[in-house]
Regions:
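Short, solvent-exposed coil/turn linker segments
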Residues: 17-19, 59, 84
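Short Cys/His-centered divalent metal-binding micro-motifs
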Residues: 44-69
Length: 97
């Protein structure tokens, strides 16, 4: 499934393009089977390694709760726009709005 978050091959956070860095896919919702749901509904994005896992507490989404919550809220809004007939909370079991 294509991403409903960003389809350009660049980091969603810093917009560094793929030819300048190695991009990684980040499933925005994870745990308890949510990775598969993220992939199924396109709730994933490209991130550079710094913003994904190696940037530490200040910048990496896996360590920065504020950034994680911001991405989750953005993804839920996009989900509601792309899938108006589906209930996000029923599917993912969480609400970020």
């Amino acid at each position: 499934m294509r991403s409903i978050i960003n389809n350009e091959y660049k980091c969603l956070i810093c917009e560094t393009p793929s030819h300048e860095t190695h991009l990684q896919t980040h499933n925005i919702f994870y745990g308890n089977g949510r990775e598969a749901l993220s992939e199924k509904y396109g709730c994933w994005c490209y991130l550079c390694a710094r913003h994904h896992i190696i940037g530490g507490n200040a910048v990496a989404v896996h360590f920065n709760k504020k950034l994680d919550k911001k991405l989750k809220a953005h993804a839920q809004k996009r989900f509601n726009e792309v899938y108006p007939d589906l209930n996000f909370t029923q599917i993912f079991g969480e609400n970020h709005l």
